[in-house]
Structures are given as C-alpha cells and as structure tokens.
Amino acid sequence: MTDLPDSTRWQLWIVAFGFFMQSLDTTIVNTALPSMAQSLGESPLHMHMVIVSYVLTVAVMLPASGWLADKVGVRNIFFTAIVLFTLGSLFCALSGTLNELLLARALQGVGGAMMVPVGRLTVMKIVPREQYMAAMTFVTLPGQVGPLLGPALGGLLVEYASWHWIFLINIPVGIIGAIATLMLMPNYTMQTRRFDLSGFLLLAVGMAVLTLALDGSKGTGLSPLTIAGLVAVGVVALVLYLLHARNNNRALFSLKLFRTRTFSLGLAGSFAGRIGSGMLPFMTPVFLQIGLGFSPFHAGLMMIPMVLGSMGMKRIVVQVVNCFGYRRVLVATTLGLSLVTLLFMTTALLGWYYVLPFVLFLQGMVNSTRFSSMNTLTLKDLPDNLASSGNSLLSMIMQLSMSIGVTIAGLLLGLFGSQHVSVDSGTTQTVFMYTWLSMALIIALPAFIFARVPNDTHQNVAISRRKRSAQ
C-alpha cells in the first residue's frame, strides 16, 4: 500500500480506528460486570443484559447500515456512527440505574452497527480492487488487537479507577475520530433501490421481542402471560417476513439464498454454534471473579491466552479445512469446544489455576477454527448475485445468536442460583458448575447439524476466497 496517496492512507487509518473502537467495546465491558452490579445495586445475575442490549441492537441495525451509507454517503454515516457511539459511551458513564445503562448501550449499538460495515464499504470505494485485500488486512488488524486489550484494560480500569472509565475513555478518542472523518473522508454515494422497510421492521420486531421473551421472568421480571404474548408477537413477525419475502425481488434477504444447501446448513450451524460460544466471553470473567474470587484485572489477564490462541489459529485454518474437510473439522471442533469447556470448569473448581491459561489458549484455538469454518462454509457456494445478501444475513445472525447465547447464560445462572451471589461461597461454585455443564451440552448440540454437511474436501479451496468477507 506504499503507492497509495497520503489522503487515502489517512482514510484507512480512520476506518481502522473505527474497527478498533467497536472491537474493544465488545470485550472491555465483560470484566467490569460484577463491579457494575455492585455500583448499581443489582444482582450480578442480571448484568448479562448490558451485553445483550448492545449486541442485539447491532444485529437489528446491521441490515440498514449499507443502504444508509449508499443513500446518504459513507462519510456522513461513518461520522454519525462515531458520534452515536461516543454519545452512548457518555450516557453509559453517567447512568445511575441498570435501565439507564441498557438504553445507553442500545445507543452505542446503533453506532457500532454502522461503524464496521460502512468502514468495509469505504475501503472498497477508496482503494483499487487489486489492493483491497491488503487494505482490509491493514484496517482489520486493530480490530484483532481490541479483543486482546479489552479484558485486561477493563479489569485495570475497574480495579484502579471505576467502571465508568471503560466508557469515558471512548469520548476523547471519539471526538478526534469524528473530526478526522469530517476533514479527511470523502462522501461517496451510490444509486440505491428502495429500502425494504417493511421487511426490516418485521425482522427487527421478531428478533427483539423473542430475545426479550427468552430472558423471561428471571431476567426482566415479566409475567408468564406477557412472555407468551411476546413469543406470539415474535413468531407472527417472522412468519410475516417469510410471506413478505416470498417472490419479492426487493426483500431485505431473498429466500433464494436457502436453495444453496451449504448456505442453509452453514447458517443453521452458525446460529446454533454461536449461541454456545457466545456464552463463553460473558461467563468466563464473571465466573473467575464471582465464583473464584479473582480481581477484575487478574480476570482480564486470564482472557488474553484465549485471544492469542484464536489469532494464532487463523494462520493455519485454511490448511486444516482443506486437509480434513468441513464436516470433520466442524464436528470435531464443536465437540472439542464442549470438552474444553468442561476441562476449564474442572481445573478451575479443583484450584489448578496455573493450568487455566493453557486451557483458555486451547479454547481460543478450537473456537477460531470453528468460526472460520462456519463462516466460509456458509458463503462458499453462493452465486455472485446473492453473495452480498448472504454475507449481510450471516453478519446479522452472528450478532443475534451471540445475544441469545449471553441471554441463555444469564438465564441458566438465574435458574441455578439465588438473587445474590457471594464470593467464595460453596453454593456459588455449585451454581456455576451446573451452569457450565449446561453450557457444554448446548455447545455440543450443533454437531448434529454439521454432521449433515457433505465432506467435499476438493471444494474447500473456496475458503481462501471467502474467508475475509465473512469475518
């Protein structure tokens, strides 16, 4: 990229900065949840909604981000995304109740939903096609550093300052990023077709109310009648979307996507698989602090081996899949992740803390292999005219399933535990043990889906073409 103009390189730095902000925020909050609960006077068992409110909002808003960027301009939307994300961070820091914090996190999620896809779109428009892969590698690298720094930085700020600072640090960075965007980024627009507002609203309502219903009485205190009503509304909304999308060329997501068998299996497996793996980043730091008495900073440091294992495995995942095939790799990594989850619980409860970094490193390796394989299996056989729509649907499903996973983890803690959990309590460790056992079972279930994948090793070369677009 050395032959790119200085203005283009600065624009790539702005996009990279947005990727870093978004990825850092997805992990920095996890280690702060017990401290937030204490400060806000809430049970730690309710704090999963701090993550769910953000991730679910991202899932709901993702389908609109690309259309908005084409219609209004990439600079205007990227600037708006940074401003909303920064304002959300400010309101998070000022929150005095859990409900205020959830609303602020939702505002953050609106900004986060637009930041990454619009950033990708910006790179496509400002960089020559032959340099696109190198440019995307450059801008996504900070996004890989964010999860590495997030848990430890969050723990450090909580331990030596307060949880408010995990949001306050976004404000000066966001102001600088917003000014740089206005000054340096071009405002590319494109001719757009009419946005499928009806389909968007139906999907948004379906996803939101079903997730809220899943949290149910344990998380939100809803009555059984209200939960039943939410389930009915959610199911009706999704059925109406299917009827709306039938034979509709302007539908948000075409049902023609599901004529490709690998897409259908990959999407179903990705949805089920990420429900299980989405529990781990939430449960691990909470368990280390509440169940084992680790400090926030120590718990954050323990998450680093998992990220390192994930980053290291990405270098060889193509060769692994090409050698063994999708079916073997996905079934093995799904069952392997379930076993590693049980191994983590066992070593932790036995007090073998020195083994935990190695277990978490292994967990990161297995999870990374499964993620990359799921992503590329889903997209590799789609025709070119459906690839963009399929990628957008996969991105939405990834966020939705992670929010459901965190919701289920919080629900399991609520089912097995009391309203208040104390550190070093034998009862607390029993609650976490039952929760981890249930999680291991949920993580293993998608193996039944992946067992139906054709083991067509000779087609796996497509992973190298699709890998980056799916991440």
From Swiss-Prot:
It is a multi-pass membrane protein. Its main location: membrane. The keyword Heme does not apply. Keywords: Cell inner membrane, Cell membrane, Membrane, Transmembrane, Transmembrane helix, Transport. GO terms for molecular function: transmembrane transporter activity. One of its GO terms (cellular component) is plasma membrane. It is found in: Cell inner membrane. PANTHER family: BLR6921 PROTEIN, MAJOR FACILITATOR SUPERFAMILY MULTIDRUG TRANSPORTER MFSC. HAMAP family: MFS_MdtD. This is Putative multidrug resistance protein MdtD. The gene is mdtD.
